[in-house]
Amino acid sequence: AFVLVLSFFLFVPDGRVPKPEKTGKTIDLRVETNKADLTALINRYLREEKIKGKVLLNDEVVYYGTVGVFSEKMQYKMTFKPKALKNGDLVLKQKSVSLGSVHLPVSYILKFVKTTYHLPKWVIIQPGEKLVYVQLQNMKLENGAKVKVNEFDLQHDDISFTLGFPK
């Protein structure tokens, strides 16, 4: 016991216990997931927010929805290529859009979605650029946490986020 106490005082200057280093304004946790689990989480969020449609993550992001055409409901499909940005946000570059079996101009459908659906403020649709900008850092979580995407490689099922909790 004497050796333990002596070594403590030898390695701690002035006999004071070092304080933990402050690493920033948040406590960061890295979360790794897979396509199947993230697909389930996204679809749960869509249901809770009453956003009609479903997402499927395979080698790309696929969104399925329905739209009224005359008196009929038709299913549409949008495919996106995701890209994680260094600031923690996510860009979804639109690859294709189809309504039933008809392929439509991407910018037209994105403009339709932007004006028709009530999307969260942190989802920015840019029809002219053919992309959806997902500002994850502006997403409001109940506990004040912030989300940043680290990796979003669907082909290799390598998906990770950092959750930053306020101190």
Predicted regions mapped to residue ranges:
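Extracellular/lumenal and peripheral-membrane lipid-interaction modules
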Residues: A1-K167
